[in-house]
């Protein structure tokens, strides 16, 4: 298909308000085709997409006819009815999803990661009313974690810059320290995970356990720097939650459905959550869908005397009734199963981390390389000894230089002031050895370009 670029750019500038974009002097890029891991722009230039759609979503790659056909077929048969009524793809998808999540039981559908987390917060607060006389409604969140863009989820946001100018926020949310191993105040010690986790207990005791009902965390901090918790961390978090009767919510919006080499990120860490939220990779971006998944125990807290008209979960999501989402999600899971993409993710993830670490000898501004599966971060610093973060302008230039080299990468952005210095990589689970090597080579070239530009 041919396009009139000048016309589209003019219309874009006139009518479109882009996400996360300063529009002063803005020249829009327009992508017109995706196939596998490749994106083609309106000028015909092709890029290797190492960020799965920019925000870590297209887990099984572009151009999946199987998913498109499943959605089209379902839309013709039954496109929508509010989710108080059952439909075939929701039932089948829910069964399939729960089969990947031992210990979990119920699936509640909505439209986005923010919405999925809002549902989790409402569950916690209503349980506080139903079981604790209005107490235990507070929610603890971890510094540098991100859970969404609504006022409620921003109230639980550990990334200060994302919250600027959007307050006042909802009451009853409390922050506890991050799990950044690279910059840990505890240094290198055998029980680092336990020490980091026990910082949660200190906040609980300060706020008061009777005021608190839940803890929410990402399995790996994503947009806050790709932080992988150390051994022993989540086991201790779970023990603390049990001690103070707190529900553990794990936000798998980024890591869920294979991103880290397991179905869910938490499955690397020997921890059983009470609530799991997910979105992005659930349908690989082919249709909007998110899920709030609970244990049977949590679900049963809302199965009460019908005469009590306040005692069930009085919540709805309009597009939680759109059947395209679960139809796409079911096909997405079947592709991951059939093509052994979890195994491929683990293998290619190891190759990616090895390749990136191999660049450290050549590029001294690389302070740390970390990640799990096909989810990796490269923290850039002025000096490895002091770990002083590089200027954000340098990290921004790296993204641009990588694009010039034909590879789309990301970076932490508007997250943690002075620490928006981590490059982010999240290629599709279908990546081959050749794809990984091309990503590493593109980043190597970008580092050389940027180092020369800034005299580093």
From Swiss-Prot:
Optimum temperature is 35 degrees Celsius. GO terms for cellular component: cytosol. It catalyses: taurine + pyruvate = sulfoacetaldehyde + L-alanine; hypotaurine + pyruvate = 2-sulfinoacetaldehyde + L-alanine; 3-oxopropanoate + L-alanine = beta-alanine + pyruvate. Pathway: Organosulfur degradation; alkanesulfonate degradation. Its cofactor is pyridoxal 5'-phosphate. InterPro entries: Aminotrans_3 (IPR005814), Aminotrans_3_PPA_site (IPR049704), PyrdxlP-dep_Trfase (IPR015424), PyrdxlP-dep_Trfase_major (IPR015421), PyrdxlP-dep_Trfase_small (IPR015422). SUPFAM superfamilies: PLP-dependent transferases. The modification N6-(pyridoxal phosphate)lysine is found at residue 280. Keywords: Aminotransferase, Cytoplasm, Pyridoxal phosphate, Pyruvate, Transferase. Optimum pH is 9.0. PROSITE patterns: AA_TRANSFER_CLASS_3 (PS00600). Its main location: cytoplasm. One of its GO terms (biological process) is alkanesulfonate catabolic process. Its EC number is 2.6.1.77. GO terms for molecular function: beta-alanine:pyruvate transaminase activity; pyridoxal phosphate binding; taurine-pyruvate aminotransferase activity. CDD domains: OAT_like. Belongs to the class-III pyridoxal-phosphate-dependent aminotransferase family. Homotetramer. Taurine is an abundant dietary and host-derived molecule whose metabolism to hydrogen sulfide (H2S) by members of the human gut microbiota has many prominent connections to host health and disease. The human gut bacterium and opportunistic pathogen Bilophila wadsworthia produces H2S when respiring sulfite (HSO3-) released from organosulfonate substrates such as taurine and isethionate. Involved in an anaerobic respiration pathway that converts the sulfonate taurine (2-aminoethanesulfonate) to ammonia, acetate and sulfide. Catalyzes the initial metabolic reaction of anaerobic taurine degradation, i.e. the transamination reaction between taurine and pyruvate leading to sulfoacetaldehyde and alanine. Is also able to transaminate hypotaurine (2-aminosulfinate), beta-alanine and with low activity cysteine and 3-aminopropanesulfonate in vitro. In addition to pyruvate, 2-oxobutyrate and oxaloacetate can also be used as amino group acceptors. This is Taurine--pyruvate aminotransferase. It comes from Bilophila wadsworthia.
